[in-house]
Regions:
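Short, low-complexity, Pro/Ser/Thr/Gly-rich segments in the mature regions of secreted, periplasmic
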Residues: 184-188
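Hydrophobic packing positions characteristic
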Residues: 7, 11-174, 189
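Divalent metal-coordination and catalytic microenvironments
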Residues: 181
Length: 189
């Protein structure tokens, strides 16, 4: 499809098509999420960008996501207070775009991500309540895929087997041709 200018964005240009003369802001700016409940449900955020507008909140910042389309895409909204990188469409401060997030300190990095030794490949997704998914290239029992709930229930799939725990003592292990329930209380070969 051919790109069509947004008719609601006439503020970017005069009626004759000439660019408006106002301060332009190019590049990325540090911001903070003030509101993540978008009334239009489009993944927009209200942010504060001190280097551009001081303490005044921006208009709704459009998301820049890796995949988006009709009934498909990736949605991951940061919490209020999170650090976000903000750009401005054609440099116009009235049209912010949130393009990603950053951690303000090492204490903010998800705990599951810290379980992977530095230098080894892993991808971690973790919610604020500690529900998480880790995909790791670590060899053996510490690698593979791990789903973990906030209460400790886990599902681990790796080269050594499949391990399911409910976080309350029950466990199911599938290793080779053997199924073990509750640490050997029942073994099926």
């Amino acid at each position: 499809p051919e790109f069509q200018p947004d008719p609601q964005r006439s503020d970017l240009h005069h009626a004759n098509g000439a660019r408006m003369s106002q301060q332009r802001y190019y590049g990325k700016y540090r911001g903070m999420v003030l509101n993540n409940i978008d009334p239009m449900q489009q993944g927009r955020l209200q942010v504060q960008v001190p280097d551009v507008a001081g303490l005044v909140p921006t208009s709704w910042a459009m998301p820049c996501v890796p995949v988006a389309g009709i009934q498909n895409g990736m949605v991951a909204l940061p919490m209020i207070g999170s650090g976000v990188w903000v750009e401005f469409e054609q440099g116009n401060p009235d049209h912010p775009i949130w393009v990603g997030c950053f951690w303000g300190s090492a204490a903010e990095i998800p705990a599951l991500a810290l379980a992977t030794p530095p230098g080894l490949s892993a991808i971690t997704f973790q919610t604020p309540l500690q529900n998480g998914l880790t995909i790791s290239d670590l060899p053996g029992p510490t690698g593979g895929i791990m789903l973990k709930s906030a209460t400790g229930a886990t599902l681990i799939v790796n080269d050594t087997g499949i391990y399911i725990q409910n976080g309350k003592g029950a466990m199911l292990t599938l290793v080779g041709p053997t199924v073990t329930i509750n640490n050997g209380a029942l073994t099926v070969i």
